[in-house]
Amino acid sequence: MFFNAESLQEGYSYNTSSYLYQFLIISTFQIGMIFVLMPFSVWGFYATDREKHMLEEFAMIPGSSKQFVIARVSVIIAIYMMLFVSSLPIISLSCIYSGLPWRKILRLGIMMLICTFWSASISVFSFSYCKKGIWAFAQNTAIEAMFVLGTVLATEIIRSFSISVTGAESLAPIAINLCMLFSLLNPLAAYMGYYGNITGDSGLMNLYCGRIGIDSSTQTFSFLFYKAASIVCILMGIAFIALAIWQMEKQAKE
């Protein structure tokens, strides 16, 4: 009886790219669930608070608006980060078999934290601003759509206008700068940079960058679609939290 090491190795061979895309599919699904489920989660919180008249009680306590808003955002972040924690076993196996370094998992956790903070801040602001849950839900959906889809539509309009004016396929420098600015306002830009960083800036990411005149092989791409977009996302979340606190204090005075 002979031991054939070559046959053994062939029998246990696997395609690392399949595990790589398994990791990306799971992470993309998690990010998508944040934006889809967030309005429903916050709606449930505020519906319960209004039924128990907790909002009126908090409004009567000076300085409680800040504590209430921060507490709500913190609870929502904790709930959605459990989605990331629960997927760690599968994600870890995907990293092991695809050869991805462990820091990619850490980056995914940071991306989920940033996206959750951004979406939760907008949702808390919407439900603090509108007294009717259905109007708050509609406002929340409209604001998120404006930043996620509206910025993409704006870049496409700028691109088409630049091409029609110059008559060339390449965009004017001012058009490229405007497209970069609108891309920074899109919370998915940070995740798109994360996705492109893993896959080598290929596929949809490369196509999008090529259409708006951004070279995905430069350092500008790495800074714009990963670091700067994440910072802008955090700053927008802080701004919406400040607006929610201001709105609750305004309602308390009325």
What residue ranges belong to the model's regions?
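Hydrophobic alpha-helical transmembrane segments in multi-pass membrane proteins
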Residues: 1, 32, 75-92, 112, ...
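Short cytosolic juxtamembrane segments of multi-pass membrane proteins
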Residues: 248-254
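Helix-loop-helix units of permease transmembrane domains in multi-pass membrane transporters
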Residues: 43-81
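Terminal transmembrane helical anchor/hairpin motif
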Residues: 3-17, 149-239, 243
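Membrane-interfacial helix-loop-helix connectors in multipass membrane proteins
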Residues: 9-20, 89-113
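Long, hydrophobic alpha-helical segments
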Residues: 22-48, 52
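Hydrophobic alpha-helical transmembrane segments of polytopic membrane proteins
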Residues: 107-135, 144-148
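Hydrophobic/aromatic residues in alpha-helical transmembrane segments
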Residues: 38-42, 90, 121-122, 244
